[in-house]
Amino acid sequence: MESKWSCKLTRNAEADLDSILRYLAVELANPNAAAAFADKLQAAMEEACTFPESGSLVINEYLPNTGVRKKVIGNYLMYYLPDPAEETVSVLRIVYGRRNIDEILRYIGI
């Protein structure tokens, strides 16, 4: 079994997570859905930190050869960047899958 790398959320990912949880818990009045999403996100992050290359490599004109990967979490996508030198995984964004992904990736900030 591979060693587990450290995981961190960028400021953008933290803001995304806050927005998603608020939307699910408050706007949809479904705190159970918010808790379930948080659990699924935690599991996806743990998997990414244990197996950094487990997510699909993102092929996009705005991210040429960057090594950014993604994992699907229900209706959402978690974009992350493994750093083998530092043995860290940086979660860059967590976004609703039906958003304009090109626009998200264009300004992902790596």
Regions found by a protein language model. Give the residues of each.
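Aromatic side chains
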Residues: 5, 23, 37, 51, ...
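Arg/Lys-rich, positively charged N-terminal/basic patches that mediate binding to nucleic acids
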Residues: 1-40
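Hydrophobic recognition helices of helix-based DNA-binding modules
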Residues: 20, 24, 45-48, 52
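Basic/aromatic recognition patch in beta-strand/loop cores that engages polyanionic ligands
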Residues: 50-85
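Enriched for short, Lys/Arg-rich terminal
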Residues: 73-77, 81-110
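Residue-level signal for pocket-adjacent positions within structured domains
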Residues: 2, 52, 58, 90, ...
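Residue-level recognition of specific faces of alpha-helices
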Residues: 16, 40, 44-47, 70
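Short capping/connector residues at structural and topological boundaries
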Residues: 6, 68, 106-109
